[in-house]
Amino acid sequence: MAARLCCQLDPARDVLCLRPVSAESCGRPVSGSLGDLSSPSPSAVPADHGAHLSLRGLPVCAFSSAGPCALRFTSARRMETTVNAHQILPKVLHKRTLGLSAMSTTDLEAYFKDCLFKDWEELGEEIRLKVFVLGGCRHKLVCAPAPCNFFTSA
């Protein structure tokens, strides 16, 4: 079973949203509230959090009917990883937090969709997903990461 994630930037809140794409959604993100990242809600993640899907390395909120938490990139320091050390993304995000002119929302969305998702698909490097999810998500991983190559972008 393929795991399809929709990557969207919300310029109004300056957050990156990763949401599962259901078969009925035709490529649109699953509707529902993303919730407040600063105050965890026990009801935000159902008891049956989808572990049966065998998507190792995803946080439990990835299986919530409301979709995963929005990832708030508020610090370039969080993004200084081997994943993007050679990219300009940390500098761009830092400039955005300072209110300076930087990469457009469209360009950032293209970066995540075309570069990161493509790498996950072709190389099966799940650690990339883990890094970005842990960058802003309050939920813990379902289980330890394992090699996989079934991620596709919407």
Swiss-Prot record:
Renumbered residue ranges of the record's region Mitochondrial targeting sequence: 68-117
Gene Ontology, cellular component aspect: host cell mitochondrion; host cell nucleus
Pfam family of the protein (one): X
A GO biological process held by the record: viral genome replication
Keywords: Activation of host NF-kappa-B by virus, Activator, Apoptosis, Host cytoplasm, Host G2/M cell cycle arrest by virus, Host mitochondrion, Host nucleus, Host-virus interaction, Modulation of host cell cycle by virus, Transcription, Transcription regulation
Xref: InterPro entries: Transactivation_prot_X
Keyword set includes Transcription: yes
Localisation: Host cytoplasm; Host nucleus; Host mitochondrion
PTM comment text: A fraction may be phosphorylated in insect cells and HepG2 cells, a human hepatoblastoma cell line. Phosphorylated in vitro by host protein kinase C or mitogen-activated protein kinase. N-acetylated in insect cells.
Major place of residence: host cell
Domain of life: Viruses
Record function comment: Multifunctional protein that plays a role in silencing host antiviral defenses and promoting viral transcription. Does not seem to be essential for HBV infection. May be directly involved in development of cirrhosis and liver cancer (hepatocellular carcinoma). Most of cytosolic activities involve modulation of cytosolic calcium. The effect on apoptosis is controversial depending on the cell types in which the studies have been conducted. May induce apoptosis by localizing in mitochondria and causing loss of mitochondrial membrane potential.
Subunit structure: May form homodimer. May interact with host CEBPA, CFLAR, CREB1, DDB1, E4F1, HBXIP, HSPD1/HSP60, NFKBIA, POLR2E and SMAD4. Interacts with host SMC5-SMC6 complex and induces its degradation. Interacts with host TRPC4AP; leading to prevent ubiquitination of TRPC4AP. Interacts with host PLSCR1; this interaction promotes ubiquitination and degradation of HBx and impairs HBx-mediated cell proliferation.
Family: Belongs to the orthohepadnavirus protein X family.
Protein name, as recorded: Protein X
Gene that this polypeptide is encoded by: X
